[in-house]
UniProtKB/Swiss-Prot annotation:
Pfam families: HATPase_c_3, HSP90. Residues 342-562 are annotated as: B. This is Chaperone protein HtpG. Homodimer. InterPro entries: HATPase_C_sf (IPR036890), Heat_shock_protein_90_CS (IPR019805), HSP90_C (IPR037196), Hsp90_fam (IPR001404), Hsp90_N (IPR020575), Ribosomal_Su5_D2-typ_SF (IPR020568). It comes from Cupriavidus necator (strain ATCC 17699 / DSM 428 / KCTC 22496 / NCIMB 10442 / H16 / Stanier 337) (Ralstonia eutropha). SUPFAM superfamilies: ATPase domain of HSP90 chaperone/DNA topoisomerase II/histidine kinase, HSP90 C-terminal domain, Ribosomal protein S5 domain 2-like. The keyword Nucleotide-binding applies. It is found in: Cytoplasm. The lineage of its organism: Bacteria, Pseudomonadati, Pseudomonadota, Betaproteobacteria, Burkholderiales. Molecular chaperone. Has ATPase activity.
Length: 633
């Protein structure tokens, strides 16, 4: 037996969202109608889907529609759908809480800047709560399909932190939302204004949106409402129409509907595919990454329809994980209506759709990246800033398209004195020096650390460009991207670095002489660093720094070891190699020191400085400070 009346509190995040939304989204308040119509549309989609297995849920009322009615005297606006409806528990859960992963992290991103917060909140998806932008009280009456009339509920709130829920009787299946408008919001009581908003945002909704029909009364010179209802939208699925019949504004409105995003997309592609598998795809590239893109519970995937019947919201099997940010719709003519997620994983048709959608998305990105128009290339720059790290995952996830994905990658490099990732691998290859047969890169935690790495000194001396890689995904990506255009990708921090034709015979002879001259010092340094360094040697790769650490061939880099440890994973305990610059005063001083504390301290300082320069952490910072103080005294 359900309680007839209860007063309950909103989840803390809902209170915060209501406050921020009312203040941040007020300038674009008409979106409340778009959000409520979208919810009503989703409710009818869910009913259609559940009715496939249980036709009795339709309750002899298969004419699915949304009704919108304004009452000027009562100053109310009512949105009604005959979709799936809600039970008492569903109403409490859906209307009183935000059931999304990453919600707390989202609120931590809010800055207090009204314009920035408005974009974030719009991206988060305000949904039902947008009603409070224009209403000071909202009443929801709902009954879930399949439950009795006595199981209906009324949910009501003024948005002040609490809501009431009551048991009521309701014969009609579905949901009615009544907005009691705030003072000054009479604009939304105008049928003309409401129709304009619907046609702007919701014309593409695939079921009719109906309003009371009005006719011109010559005697009063006003429009008079009749008892008849009329559709005020086209009521046909946008993706089923011919591309030539759809405007850019309509494509944008549809994107905003399915993505719950206030911004326009960067690009879209709309195609009907025939052949082994027959389907229609409408895919969008968003302009902004969702706040929970990196949350493991992030709901990704396309809306899946079968013969225009909604099946599921987040069919993640239709695109690979690295394209999880793509929004859109796929309507298949071949899949069964009762398709399950398990069946999607095994279906040959789904595999064909996945391959087709992947190729279309990559083609869109290639078109933007290679465009002769600066505005289109600027869109790719925006895309890369938002989704570049996700796209890098494709190097490891999508071997079939590895070459295409590699051409889309962008990096910072020593060619430009900026942290902006705007260098393509093809552009790097085009600038390679005569005799250069490798693509060189350095990895670090930050752009500054990469730019100032001691490993770059010999490359600057020779005028060789080096890619500066600072994303956490880079080291993992490089384990799959071994070459590009026949050129091997090589870390400048490799101990066996071979500059090939870029190193002349005189340099090689000088290196051999230095190794012989410094053998005694190097052997003593090895003894000092036993257990910390795999080897010690002199190098000519340094021009300004006294020392650097490099990795032996086949060993994991120190940077990757640190990343794995930060992620709580085990990393091989590979010791680095210490390389010393024989021309540096700090190193030359070693020759004058006998074995003992002074020699040992200087060697330890040179090792620790090299570790710090590559972003590493000292095991004993206090001991390092004491040694440096001795040297300075």
């Amino acid at each position: 037996m359900t309680a007839p009346h209860e007063t309950m509190s909103f989840q803390a995040e809902v209170k915060q969202l209501l406050h921020l939304m009312i203040h941040s989204l007020y300038s674009n308040k008409e979106i409340f109608l778009r959000e409520l119509v979208s919810n009503a549309s989703d409710a009818t989609d869910k009913l259609r889907f559940e009715a496939i297995a249980n036709p009795s849920l339709l309750e002899n009322d298969a004419d699915l529609a949304i009704r919108i009615e304004a009452d000027a005297k009562a100053r109310t606006l009512t949105i009604t759908d005959n979709g799936i409806g809600m039970s008492r528990d569903e109403a409490i859960h859906n209307l009183g809480t935000i059931a999304r992963s990453g919600t707390k992290e989202f609120f931590q991103q809010l800055s207090g800047d009204q314009q920035k917060d408005a974009a974030l909140i719009g991206q988060f998806g305000v949904g039902f709560y947008s009603a409070f932008i224009v209403a000071d009280k909202v009443t929801v009456e709902t009954r879930r399909a399949g439950l009795g009339a006595e199981d209906a509920v009324r949910w009501e709130s003024t948005g002040d932190g609490e809501f009431t829920i009551d048991a009521i009787a309701r014969n009609e299946r579905g949901t009615t939302i009544t907005l009691h408008l705030r003072e000054g919001e009479d604009d939304f009581l105008s049928a003309w204004r409401l129709k304009g908003i619907i046609q702007k945002y919701s014309d593409h909704i695939s079921l009719p949106i109906r309003m009371p029909k009005e006719v011109w009364d010559a005697e009063s010179s006003t429009y008079q409402r009749t008892a008849e209802w009329e559709s005020v939208n086209q009521a046909s699925a946008l993706w089923t129409r011919a591309k030539s019949d759809i405007t850019d504004e309509q494509y944008t409105a549809f994107y905003q509907h399915i993505a719950h995003d206030n911004e326009a997309p960067l690009a879209w592609t709309h195609n009907r595919v025939e052949g082994r598998s027959e389907y229609t795809q409408l895919l969008y590239i968003p302009a902004r990454a969702p706040f929970d893109l990196w949350d493991r519970n992030h709901k990704a995937g396309l809306k899946l329809y079968v013969k225009r019947v909604f099946i599921m919201d987040d069919a993640d099997q239709l695109l690979p994980g690295y394209l999880r940010w793509v929004k859109g719709v796929v309507d298949s003519a071949d899949l069964p209506l009762n398709v399950s997620r398990e069946l999607l994983q095994e279906s040959r048709d789904v595999k064909a759709i996945r391959e087709g959608c992947t190729k279309r998305v990559l083609s869109m990105l290639e078109t933007l990246a290679d465009s002769e128009e600066e505005a289109e290339r600027a869109k790719y720059t925006t895309f890369w800033q938002q989704f570049g790290q996700a796209l890098k995952e494709g190097i490891g996830e999508d071997q079939a398209n590895l070459e295409r994905v590699a051409k889309l990658l962008r990096f910072a490099s020593t060619h430009n004195d900026t942290a902006e990732q705007n260098v393509a691998l093809a552009a790097y290859v085009g600038r390679m020096k005569e005799g250069q047969d490798k693509i060189y890169y350095v990895t670090a935690d930050t752009w500054s650390a990469a730019k100032n790495s001691p490993h770059l000194e010999v490359f600057r001396k020779k005028g060789i460009e080096v890619l500066l890689l600072t994303d956490r995904v880079d080291e993992w990506m490089l384990s799959f991207l071994r070459e590009f255009d026949g050129k091997e990708l090589v870390s400048v921090a490799r101990g066996d670095l071979d500059l090939g034709k870029l190193a002349d015979e005189a340099e090689k002879a000088e290196q051999e002489k230095a190794e012989a001259d410094w053998k005694d010092v190097v052997d003593r340094a090895k003894t000092v660093l036993d257990g910390k360094a795999k080897d010690v040697r002199v190098t000519l790769r340094l021009t300004a720094s006294a020392s650097c650490l490099v990795s032996d061939e086949g060993d994991m880099s120190g940077y990757l070891q640190r990343l794995l440890k930060q992620a709580g994973q085990k990393a091989p305990d590979a010791q680095p190699i210490l390389e010393l610059n024989p021309e540096h005063a700090l190193v030359q001083k070693l020759r004058d020191l006998p074995e003992g504390d002074a020699f040992s301290d200087r060697v330890q300082v040179l090792f620790d400085q090299a570790l710090l320069a590559e972003g590493g952490m000292l095991d004993d910072p206090a001991a390092y400070v004491q040694r440096v103080n001795k040297l300075l005294a």
